[in-house]
Amino acid sequence: MDELQKLEYLSLVSKICTELDNHLGINDKDLAEFIIDLENKNRTYDTFRKALLDNGAEFPDSLVQNLQRIINLMRPSRPGGASQEKTVGDKKEDKKSQLLKMFPGLALPNDTYSKKEESDDDEKVKAKPEKHSETHKKTDMSDVDAAMMELEALAPGEGATLVRPHKEVSSRDRHKRRSRDRDTKRRSRSREDRHSDRRRSRSRDKERRRRSRSRDNRRRSRSREDRDRDRDRRHKSSSSRDHHERRRRSRSRSTERRDRRDRSRDCSEKMPPPSAAMTDDPEAGKIYSGKIANIVPFGCFVQLFGLRKRWEGLVHISQLRAEGRVTDVTEVVTRNQTVKVKVMSITGQKVSLSMKEVDQDSGKDLNPLSHAPEDDESLRDRNPDGPFSSSTSMLNLQGNGMEGDEHESRKRVTRISSPERWEIKQMISSGVLDRSEMPDFDEETGLLPKDEDDEADIEIEIVEEEPPFLSGHGRALHDLSPVRIVKNPDGSLAQAAMMQSALSKERREQKMLQREQEIEAMPTSLNKNWIDPLPEDESRSLAANMRGMAAAPPEVPEWKKHVIGGKKSSFGKKTDLTLVEQRQSLPIYKLRDDLIKAVTDNQILIVIGETGSGKTTQITQYLGECGFTARGKIGCTQPRRVAAMSVAKRVAEEYGCRLGQEVGYTIRFEDCTSPETIIKYMTDGMLLRECLMEAELKSYSVIMLDEAHERTIHTDVLFGLLKTAVQKRPELKLIVTSATLDAVKFSQYFFKAPIFTIPGRTFPVEVLYTKEPETDYLDASLITVMQIHLREPPGDILLFLTGQEEIDTACEILYERMKSLGPDVPELIILPVYSALPSEMQTRIFDPAPAGSRKVVIATNIAETSLTIDGIFYVVDPGFVKQKVYNSKTGMDSLVVTPISQAAAKQRAGRAGRTGPGKTYRLYTERAYRDEMLPTPVPEIQRTNLATTVLQLKTMGINDLLHFDFMDAPPVESLVMALEQLHSLSALDDEGLLTRLGRRMAEFPLEPNLSKMLIMSVALQCSDEILTIVSMLSVQNVFYRPKDKQALADQKKAKFNQAEGDHLTLLAVYNSWKNNKFSNAWCYENFVQIRTLKRSQDVRKQLLGIMDRHKLDVVSAGKNSVRIQKAICSGFFRNAAKKDPQEGYRTLVDSQVVYIHPSSALFNRQPEWVIYHELVQTTKEYMREVTTIDPKWLVEFAPSFFRFSDPTKLSKFKKNQRLEPLYNKYEEPNAWRISRVRRRRN
């Protein structure tokens, strides 16, 4: 064995040790080598597992599969084998075939039908005619299928079986109905649900067997009664003189039997037909008829009918009626009254009954989910801790358990006495108590939040079994890190990024400390000064001033006033040229005819041109002028919303039409187009959604993928879809534009398409590097800007930073430093650029600087390619960018500061050479550029969460993800994680195929968990509130905190706080704005962003339109907040966290320590269980938008992901906890230890 093989073998041993440690807590090198030796001798799974069992290793099946997979994957290659050198194509095929064996769930056969053939609301299901006979037969029944699908959607759940009162259903009718149901279900079977139908057919077989057994039992019972009657007749006809007493006893017994039969026959006319044979004992969860035998102050005793033995049970006074509180039992029932009861529990001879869970008229079970009887096989097929399966959850939730929600929402408050209520009212009116501190206090009933300490300690753990289609490769796969986005994690650039994160954290902590000091200095109760008849001097005027501050619009910081120029600011023209002259001055104008000829001659064209050459605005107009719009629209995609809107506005001006007529745009939650639109700009995500409806995009004649070099996740998916579309539609033209020089890769991917180059206006650029690495790149960049301003010739400066927080900090520091230099220094105009800026501030970056002054534009990487700013001669490049990276630990995307690529560095340097010869100051060494930067940026599809992308591909019928034609394929681990996440959301079934719920989730332009939450709210009857919450979550920064009024803004925000959490706080804000007639003055008074609320209103309208199109009911939950919390839990159950005894909370998925954000409504309450919307890394890992939950809901809505822990074993959560001993707070924490005590004595 050579050195390389030894290293490979050691790596394999280390990996096996890690797996054993993760699963069993054993880290033994000898054991790992023994397992590898066993696998080498037993290559098949069965023999390998048997060998492990023979040696006493009772490992779980998932661990055995994982061990064998790792050994086969990492086994050292043997020299001298038959393997020869292979070509690159053969290696790729071998790799794909190897992945196909490892991950069969990623290579399911694609569906051949088109998405357009299905209507949005599932009313018409028309199969595409094909040559296959099976599909041809299905087309004849399409109308019947559509009708039966509607009936299935309207059908009640399994537990809600309707019963005809006072009438027995004949067995013939039952047989006919069952036959019709079976025929209906057989006809409505769809292609993708074929496997799940097999399971349903098995369950129907079990149901038929159970019913047949029930009929046999009834027949045996009737035959037994007939024999009893014959025996009675024989006893009656006997005339023996010696047995008069026995005959008399026999007659009395037969009379009693007849009486019992008559009574049971009378009772059976009132009861629903029995589903099983008569039993001796009652069964929990079943409904029985009975008679009130006795009434006591705390309830009533009911004698049960339909049992061989005499049984009586107690109906407690709380179980008599669901509506309102019962104080007197006789108000509800009377003695000898016939009622219907449900058996809740049986303890020995004591039976607990309930009347409120049974409809007294029809005998219907109002809460079938509790004590739902199931046969053994169905229990074995699903998670035993889940109260219902995911396939029937939507139907079972509809109309069931709502009374329990109302009861649960009622029991979370407690009533207080009248004197206490009076005291609290007086303290609130006097200003001693703030009304916002007691949001649940009711002045009439005196309700206060009830402490939840008395609840039972429930332990929840994650279900370790993977979905069947990911067996051995799901949750057991721990190395789920995406493609590495940093070339050298130990290099100077990575160290500088970490240092900057620490410095920004320190700045945030200082701001938080300053805010706390301002809050402490704020007067606590301003109302006192108004109520007090003899206030102190000037105290009432202080209160008036503080109140008046809220009504005024927010003040702008000093540096921002300087940026926008206050009231004196003027936004003049950048040029005196007309629109026609401006178009003719662009570099692309000279190549107009050549470009049109190239588009006409080629179906696919790659266009390369510098930023500002006119690609985005002119190519679409040229094609429209040449008649390409006669065959369809011209579509142009943009990676950003702001770019799509601004470009469409500019093109509409040049085209000479109103925006939304011939030229329009479509972005998420906003459609500014009309039937006359022929040139349409849109985000790449919107075009991808159009592909969901029509894969071939027949309404378009030309598709232009602009800014393709940015390689967003939507652009990469569109590459594969449009590559297929142009093969099916020869008349469709595809143009791919890029501002960088990676055109060869695009050309090779798109069938070696020709490249059309637009020469730019470039000048030489001098590149300067630092001699030593910079630790604080923010401070170094500001010093560089000041040096350029004070020493270099005239010319504007462009500084690249990573995000809004950094840019605002840089603007503030730079403004203060320039101010400290005095008035003799030439003016430096500071202009920030990021998407959250108001439009008037964004416009100023294009204005030329006044004579004698210089402007510095501080921007994110949007200025690399998307923006063209004239007059830039100097570029300062710290070498960093903020990228979205998928964190496999948290299962979420997070923004991380990383070094840029070499291609991005070249692009930034090119910004200095557009107007004249320029300079680029790179704040890193030349060695770092060469050794620590990747050649090109990592595509977004290789570093982000793919759940939404996989759901969209599945909706388009693309199940074979392994062979989908990606330009750069995403990591297999990311695809597996996305499939596992979709399966836990019930969007995929156990075989990896799309469910009906998943298909409906894909119709909403939301993340999968938000879509699931919105759809489940319909079943939970709270869709009106969830619609508002989702729209508020889709926007950001609802509240604002002016620097000089932070304490007052916090007070205003506190009055909206809800005891349930932040989601309901957002709902309260929107509803309050709505009740105030959407007033702008109300927003200013309460420190709420008016633009954010209006945006949320637009989002809500679009989502409401989608729900109306799908005929989803919009129902309000009223005051029942439990339903809203359940709906939130159904979508975000992965983001559950439990309070940790030591500090903060621990997430259930990865036991990460997190904290409630100080701005949360629950910050001071600290509930036991919470659900969060997202994690934010500032000074700590903070949870944003937090809501309290009941841990039982996690198992209820995610039975495939969570289950109750075994009470006889120590849960994983408690294993990770650390016992902290009590100690004297005045001494050091370890002073209680024996060693410390001895040392102190000595």
Swiss-Prot record:
Its EC number is 3.6.4.13. Residues 75-283, 354-449 are annotated as: Disordered. InterPro entries: DEAD-box_helicase_OB_fold, DHX8/Prp22_DEXHc, DHX8_GH2-like, DNA/RNA_helicase_DEAH_CS, HA2_WH, Helicase-assoc_dom, Helicase_ATP-bd, Helicase_C-like. Disruption phenotype: Lethal. RNAi-mediated knockdown in the germ line results in defective nurse cell morphology. Residues 596-759 form the Helicase ATP-binding domain. ATP binds at residues 609-616. Residues 285-356 form the S1 motif domain. Residues 197-222, 232-252 have a biased composition (Basic residues). Residues 87-97, 113-141, 180-196, 253-269 have a biased composition (Basic and acidic residues). GO terms for molecular function: ATP binding; ATP hydrolysis activity; RNA binding; RNA helicase activity. A motif (DEAH box) lies at residues 706-709. Residues 388-399 have a biased composition (Polar residues). One of its GO terms (biological process) is mRNA splicing, via spliceosome. GO terms for cellular component: catalytic step 2 spliceosome; nucleus; precatalytic spliceosome; spliceosomal complex. Residues 439-449 have a biased composition (Acidic residues). Its main location: nucleus. Keywords: ATP-binding, DNA condensation, Helicase, Hydrolase, mRNA processing, mRNA splicing, Nucleotide-binding, Nucleus, Spliceosome. It is found in: Nucleus. Residues 777-957 form the Helicase C-terminal domain. It catalyses: ATP + H2O = ADP + phosphate + H(+). Involved in pre-mRNA splicing as component of the spliceosome. Facilitates nuclear export of spliced mRNA by releasing the RNA from the spliceosome. Before and after egg-chamber formation, required for nurse-cell chromatin dispersal (NCCD) probably by playing a role in spliceosome localization to chromatin/interchromatin spaces. Identified in the spliceosome C complex. Belongs to the DEAD box helicase family. DEAH subfamily. DDX8/PRP22 sub-subfamily. This is ATP-dependent RNA helicase DHX8.
